Amino acid sequence: MANAASGMAVHDDCKLKFLELKAKRTYRFIIYKIEEKQKEVVVEKLGEPTESYEDFTAGLPADECRYAVYDFDFMTKENHQKSRIFFIAWSPDTARVRSKMIYASSKDRFKRELDGIQVELQATDPTEMGLDVFRSRAGGIEC
């Protein structure tokens, strides 16, 4: 088990599932949560490759923080298909202050455990992580 700087442990499954997403494209997305009592980051939800962006956003609670990884497919201006792995720090305004602080203090260390993140987004509401934001940050147009 890896250890985040805030004293948060990172469950081995977090890294294993990320490697499967990155290398084998087994998942479209992964949502992670911090189990405060166990002081550990764990996998909360795995999105199948066929699941959509809407399925992903529906998995993020409106009033609780989460970390997420999303494998975003897009077309470049030269008409080449590409993908980018996004790391999303979801911290809605309505989340508890303590939760926001725990997620913020653990984020960088947790992100370092996931080798291969290409783009990072921080969002406090859904408009900050819309498909248009993903497209512009990835440098292409959506597939």
UniProtKB/Swiss-Prot annotation:
Family (UniProt): Belongs to the actin-binding proteins ADF family.
Gene3D superfamilies documented for this protein: Severin
GO molecular function, one term: actin binding
Presence of the UniProt keyword Chloroplast in the record: no
Name of a matching Pfam family: Cofilin_ADF
Organism listed in the record: Petunia hybrida
Protein name: Actin-depolymerizing factor 2
Gene giving rise to this polypeptide: ADF2
Function, as annotated: Actin-depolymerizing protein. Severs actin filaments (F-actin) and binds to actin monomers.
